[in-house]
Structure formats: C-alpha cells, structure tokens
Amino acid sequence: MHGLAFTKGHGTENDFVLVPDPEGRHDLTPDEVRALADRRAGVGGDGVIRVVPTRLADDPAVRAQSGQAAWFMDYRNADGSVSEMCGNGTRVFAAYLLREGLERGGEFAIATRAGLKQVRTVAQGYAVDLGAARVDDSEGARETGFNAVVHAHGGPELPGLRVDVGNPHTVVVLPPTLALGDLDLSVAPHVAPHPSAGTNVEFVQILGSGHIAMRVHERGVGETRSCGTGAVAAAAATRWWDGADDTNREWTVDVPGGRLTVTFTDAGTAELAGPAVLVADGIWTDGAG
C-alpha cells in the first residue's frame, strides 16, 4: 500500500488517522490499520477512521442509513479490529467533513455501525448525540449496584457496572483510599464475567456534584488519553448510582487529555461535547522512499 492520503486529528488527545475513501475502493485490512496506527513505524493513533460514502459501505445495515447520513465513519481499533463507533472520533470525523466541504451547516448526521449519530457545532467544538446509555440494571445490579468484578494489575478487586453506549463498557468507581493516578493500566484489567465481545473499562473518581475524573483502558487499544463513549458510560453509571433525576443531567468529565461534557437529554439520550482538532495532512508511503 503506497501513497495513501491521510489526516491526523484528536479529540481531547484521543487521536486518530483518517483515511478518505470517496469511491469506497479501499477496505483497510487489519494489517494496514495496525501499520497506520503504529506510533513508531506508522502515523500513530488510537484508531483509524475510513471516510467513505454511506451508500458504498459493505454492511447493508449501514447502507440503510444513507438517506439520512451521507458519510460513514468506518472505525477500526489500533489492533486492527473493527469497532462499532468512537465518541471522540465522531467529533474528529465531523471536523474533517466540515473542513473538506463534505458537510455544511451547523448540524448533520454521521453513519456508524452503532446507528446514526447527530452532530452539531457548539462553543466547545462539537456535540454528538450518542443515543441512549443503557446501564445493565439486571437483577444483580439492582440488588448490589454492580454486576462485574474488575482487577487492575497490582490493585485490589473492585466492583463494576456494565453500560452499553453502542459499544461495551464496565465502570468502576474508586474508593477514597485508592487514587486514580496510582492505577497500573499498562495491561488490560481483568473483568469477570468477561463479555464475549470484550469491554472498555473506566475507572472513576468522584470530584463533586456532577463532576468526575476518569481513566480508561480501551479494548483493542490499551490506555488512552480520553474516550468519549467511556465518558458517557462513566457519567451514566455514576448518575445511576446517585439516582438519576432532573437535577443531575449534566456532567463534567476530566480525562488526562482534557475535559468533556455529558448531558442526558429529555429524549433519554446522552450528548457528548468537546473539542476536535485536525493537526496534520500527509501521504503515507508505508515506509517506501
């Protein structure tokens, strides 16, 4: 693979390589994704996003969204695996579409494997309606508040709560005796029972009313500086533990890469707001030259 155009961007330092494919001819292989995402031998990123017309997507369920969204966010994790979507990535994707004139106006839809995502420009940058954040409130969770056990490397076993934001998450709130910065996330935390599709794991420290800090280990990537859907999952779980009502709809989520805002809407969806920055354009030659 030679002469591949790309754009590099990030949302709160969760970084991505965007690959435009306006004719739908280059379905990236796992090896190509891993090579592009490699921080030493490639461009470097937490994920790779192919920018392709929705009508040319391989998946019929995605193509069905073409009447409402012109562009499909074909998201891949850094290890080459296919993912449903990425919250921070949707903002970077939106910034790219607007810069290139592929979308116009302050509000439009993006097609993803997790369904349509509505984007609008706001003072912070971009706000994306990610749909419902579904807390797994099955019987065990209703009784104890938890339905998983999470063990970070070298740390104690901690209770966790599963949340679905179009992709899987397990949220852990830290006890006062454990500092967020002390966690070793250099290896994937052990989660039991382990979901068959894997899970992102968010560790949360409560800073105040409607204000949390978070670190995340993303499936297929490792620890990242930010995770948009993870911020939504963390806010949704903390809100559920608090008792969700009209007084705790807006949450500030501090991540190592910056700050995000999560708002739970009247429609029962979660809106994620934050910055998106495009930092470079180039041609990747796969080491040639």
What are these regions (language model features)?
Residues 1-123, 170-289:
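A glycine-rich beta-to-alpha transition motif near the start of alpha/beta enzyme domains, typified by
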Residues 136, 142-146, 150-155, 163, ...:
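C-terminal domain-closing interface element
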Residues 147-181:
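Internal active-site segments that recognize and position negatively charged phosphoryl groups
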Residues 141-147, 192-197:
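Short, conserved active-site entrance elements at the starts or edges of catalytic domains
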Residues 83, 131-133:
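Flexible, glycine/proline-enriched loop segments at strand-loop-helix junctions
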Residues 124-131:
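Short, solvent-exposed secondary-structure boundary/capping segments
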Residues 47, 131, 160-162, 282:
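Glycine-centered structural positions embedded in regular secondary structure
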